[in-house]
Amino acid sequence: MAGELYKWIMDATAGAPLPFSLALVAAAFVLYNIVSIITTAYFSPLSKIPGPWYAKLTDLRLTYSVFAGNRIYYVDSLHQKYGPMVRIGPKEVDVADPAAAREVHRMGTVFTKAPFYRLLSPGPVDNIFNFRDQKKHSQRRKLYAKGFTLVELRKNWESTINKTISMAVQKMKEEAANGDTELMGWWTLMANEIVCRLTFNGGHGTVEKGIKDPFVLMLEKRKGDLAHLLKMFIPPLYYVGRVLGKVNTRMNDIFYSQEKMFKAGAGVVKSARQDKEAGEFNQNLFAKALQEGEGDAATLTDTDIITDAGALLLAGSDPTAISLTFLIYLVLSRPELQKQLEEEVASIDGEVTDTVCEGLPLMNAIIDESMRLYGAAPGGLPRSPPAGGANLGGYYIPEGTVVDTQNWTLHTDGATWKEAQTFDHTRFLPENRLEFSEKQKMAFNPFGQGSRQCLGIHLGRLEMRLAVAHFFRELRGVKLAKSATPESMAVVDSFVAGVPRDRRCEVTMKA
């Protein structure tokens, strides 16, 4: 259609005055876009999928919800009104049916990560997190997979992780004894140090000194910032920002963060390659990966190392800190449950190990229920159907559509969960979990599922188990500070994570 229109314009303007030609081109452009909008809205296969009338014509309402930090609530409200399959934009659909969501994410699925994920790369190349090509993702994941198994983590890293967590908890305990201590900040430092140590042997002393690794500091300027949002939704403003960044320091920090991050990342590469040459594979995940990929097409370049380090830090730090913060808030809001948990972890005889913690039924039920309601990634996980489209949930999804699934809805759907909005850890106790319906099993995926399941699922769970055990052993009787309220802890959808509104949660040991 576009080619035919172009030919018609060229024929119509041949020999015509310039003003007439420009006016005709402008009119044709407007007409073409109007026809495209109407065709997509009312004649696409997506027209059969229910949704608000305006979503067929524009994604402005959806975009507004992203900037307002309430996309998960907006999309969930559409599911409440229109059902498990809802059209949320001209070429975007959200799926809340557990079986259909499983089809989108299962092993061997025909759906791939949507172009949106290119924005989430901290570097100029694709990384372990955002590869759209399944083969390339599989090759890269294979380089890291062994280092992230539970067996390897316990064997090589549990001691380091335990010491780091213990130190963070002691810092909280010292502060809480004299006033308020802020949980999310300490959990973030803890998670930063653990991931830095594991990936590139960095981050030493992060918790002890209360100062993040330089690479992490630069990465945070790159993460989920205004530049990412503008590049995705309003590209012209992104390029204006790049120009202004040449003369304004603050704008430079935002719009040139990638370049600065790579400068700070030189130490990551140096550490990885030095440890590889020294054979210190247990001390550096990237050293292991370099060894695994030596002589192979999948071997890592310096750019790959920095970009993957950034991706692993983003995926491995904030989610753990956020999840622990919400979990402790939920427990401290329920004094009787707090006492039960304190008694369970106090019953540990001897050293606190992950093997022991994995066998604590109450603690693990609390962890799962907190992640059901307040998982760190409640928002959409956009995917693209294959060439030629695909059938999903009783509808045909054409090529070029974005298909989302969001845990905020899957984890709180009343059709799947009894008293879905209520925190009830007992549903995850071993005897009750055995009674889970197939629908519940498909719906509960706080770490994702299929071949794109979180690479650090075992690390995340190990950290949470040890952190919860240490915290409630050392800070027995801790209470929420006055600043920690339901309002301050309301979930805000911050583009890639669900965070407390005030981005903090204070507790105290003082009477």
From Swiss-Prot:
Alphabetized InterPro entries for the sequence: Cyt_P450, Cyt_P450_CS, Cyt_P450_E_grp-I, Cyt_P450_sf, Cytochrome_P450_monoxygenase
EC number in record: 1.-.-.-
Recorded GO CC terms: membrane
Induction of synthesis: Expression is positively regulated by the dothistromin-specific transcription factor aflR. Dothistromin biosynthetic proteins are co-regulated, showing a high level of expression at ealy exponential phase with a subsequent decline in older cultures.
Main location group: membrane
Cofactor(s) required for function per UniProt: heme
Protein localization: Membrane
UniProt cross-references to Pfam families, sorted A to Z: p450
Top-level taxon of origin: Eukaryota
Family: Belongs to the cytochrome P450 family.
Function: Cytochrome P450 monooxygenase; part of the fragmented gene cluster that mediates the biosynthesis of dothistromin (DOTH), a polyketide toxin very similar in structure to the aflatoxin precursor, versicolorin B. The first step of the pathway is the conversion of acetate to norsolorinic acid (NOR) and requires the fatty acid synthase subunits hexA and hexB, as well as the polyketide synthase pksA. PksA combines a hexanoyl starter unit and 7 malonyl-CoA extender units to synthesize the precursor NOR.
Protein name: Cytochrome P450 monooxygenase cypX
